[in-house]
């Protein structure tokens, strides 16, 4: 009798895992999506904060409208470049996430399986965050140099 109960328990467990195993993958994907969007937004804020701090500091030194216009132009270029950096590093995964999200909303789980096969998110996150930090650190002196030329 005990063996029959144990075997029934095992069969029921495997059935539950089979039924809800995909559900765990879906929940994990939504957590990855949430984290990827957070990382993208956080990186955007960090790099733009650096630019705005540099602009604010140099704007005090501007004496006429030509210098202020030059500073504004440098700021605009830096913001465009910073967004390209963010999209090229921590934001590379977002188009794939959007595609899978849309597929899951319609009930198609095939894109999720392809996403899981193509992306190792923890590894990607570490690698691209380090890459982002390097590129953001390289952008700051370039922006500062251009801003200094505006008020020279």
From Swiss-Prot:
Domain of life: Eukaryota
UniProt KW Cytoplasm keyword: no
Keywords: Disulfide bond, Secreted, Signal
Signal sequence segment: 1-21
Primary localization: secreted
Keyword Nucleotide-binding: no
Tissue specificity: Expressed by the venom gland (posterior main gland) (at protein level).
Gene Ontology CC annotation, any one: extracellular region
Cysteine disulfide links: 70-150
Localization, UniProt: Secreted
Family: Belongs to the insect vpf1 family.
Protein name: Venom protein family 1 protein 2
Species: Platymeris rhadamanthus (Red spot assassin bug)
């Amino acid at each position: 009798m005990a063996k029959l109960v144990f075997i029934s328990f095992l069969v029921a467990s495997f059935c539950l895992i089979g039924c809800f195993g995909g559900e765990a993958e879906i929940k994990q994907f939504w957590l990855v999506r949430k984290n990827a969007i957070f990382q993208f937004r956080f990186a955007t804020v960090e790099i733009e904060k650096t630019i705005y701090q540099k602009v604010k500091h140099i704007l005090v030194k501007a004496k006429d409208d030509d210098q202020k216009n030059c500073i504004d132009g440098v700021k605009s270029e830096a913001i465009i470049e910073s967004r390209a950096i963010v999209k090229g590093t921590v934001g590379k995964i977002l188009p794939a996430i959007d595609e899978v999200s849309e597929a899951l909303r319609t009930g198609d789980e095939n894109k999720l399986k392809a996403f899981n096969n193509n992306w190792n998110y923890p590894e990607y996150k570490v690698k691209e965050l380090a890459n982002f930090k390097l590129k953001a650190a390289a952008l700051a002196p370039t922006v500062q140099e251009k801003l200094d030329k505006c008020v020279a």
